[in-house]
């Protein structure tokens, strides 16, 4: 699952991975993470609640037992998944367990989005919410994105928490605002697990 901008974002902030990669929520992912990272990664594992063509391990990352190896993955990708989890704090803990110290975690979650059950739809997130759920990570490279291909707005960390009413503004050819809008809006950020 996810948007076309997920792959644009990850190519910018993490162009190559030579270690192990875990993709959480891989069943219906059309973003192409596997095709992009598998040629250079030593290992690529897709996980989901149910079987699918890109699912290597079927598991529930909110269950008491986590079948994935701890402190193992160089990169964990979790896009458009956490809004479907009734207890995201448990999932966040399980995801953090499998990222090796110094490893990366790429999270993309909706901030403004329509209801979409898979199997249900519980939450919307801000950057601060993700930082709170994953306290063992140093977060970097914040961005807003929409479902429109290439529509990514990079923001500085010091802009977090300020009024973001101008986060997406359509501009004319000279860069002057012509329309303020909030389309479906995702937040994207990558963090490095503290040693």
Task: Enumerate the language-model features and the residues they cover.
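Short, surface-exposed alpha-helical recognition segments that flank or form part
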Residues: 1, 83, 179
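Conserved SAM-binding loop
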Residues: 19-116, 191
